[in-house]
């Protein structure tokens, strides 16, 4: 399995997203890392992991960690808790930008990274 994304990369590290499917549906978090089509979001898809006894943890313990969630189960939040569908537009200088519609106006979310 390769780690290349198969879909769009509208979500990147630092974005605020909301889960639209799964056990964490409706919860909001910040993207910590992206790898392929899976994203780790702070506070979403939290699982418990049982750690065996070792020198670092003499009694053992249970830790809660965020597990990756598929990018199709997330939606970008803009201006707090409102979600928006991002579209790619080219401005006058030829730069590509993600935009969303608000009150029949196109609002720029951020620019798309230029290909190398």
Curated annotation (Swiss-Prot):
Signal peptide region: none
Annotated keywords: Ribonucleoprotein, Ribosomal protein, RNA-binding, rRNA-binding
- Provide one Gene Ontology cellular component: ribosome
Q: Which superkingdom, per the lineage?
A: Bacteria
GO MF terms held by the record? rRNA binding; structural constituent of ribosome
Record-linked Pfam families: ribosomal_L24 (PF17136)
Which chain positions lie within coiled-coil regions?
A: none
Entry-linked InterPro entries:
Rib_uL2_dom2 (IPR014722), Ribosomal_uL24 (IPR003256), Ribosomal_uL24_KOW (IPR041988), Translation_prot_SH3-like_sf (IPR008991)
Q: Could you tell me which SUPFAM superfamilies the record lists for this protein?
A: Translation proteins SH3-like domain (SSF50104)
**What processes in GO biological process is this protein linked to?**
translation
Q: Does the keyword Methyltransferase apply?
A: no
The similarity annotation says: Belongs to the universal ribosomal protein uL24 family.
HAMAP family (alphabetical): Ribosomal_uL24_B
Q: Which PANTHER family match?
A: MITOCHONDRIAL RIBOSOMAL PROTEIN L24 (PTHR12903)
Q: What does this protein do?
A: One of two assembly initiator proteins, it binds directly to the 5'-end of the 23S rRNA, where it nucleates assembly of the 50S subunit. One of the proteins that surrounds the polypeptide exit tunnel on the outside of the subunit.
Quote the subunit structure annotation: Part of the 50S ribosomal subunit.
What name appears for this protein in its UniProt entry? Large ribosomal subunit protein uL24
* Organism this protein belongs to: Protochlamydia amoebophila (strain UWE25)
Upper classification of the source organism reads: Bacteria, Pseudomonadati, Chlamydiota, Chlamydiia, Parachlamydiales
């Amino acid at each position: 399995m390769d780690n290349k994304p198969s879909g769009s990369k509208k979500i990147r590290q630092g974005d605020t997203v909301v889960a639209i499917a799964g056990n964490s549906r409706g919860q909001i978090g910040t993207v910590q890392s992206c790898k392929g089509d899976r994203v780790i979001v702070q506070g979403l898809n939290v699982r418990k992991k049982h750690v065996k006894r070792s020198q670092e943890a003499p009694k053992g313990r249970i830790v809660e960690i965020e597990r990756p969630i598929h990018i199709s189960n997330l939606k970008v939040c803009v201006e707090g808790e409102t979600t928006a569908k991002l579209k790619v537009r080219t401005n006058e200088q030829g730069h590509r930008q993600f935009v969303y519609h608000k009150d029949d106006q196109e609002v720029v979310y951020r620019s798309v990274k230029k290909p190398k």
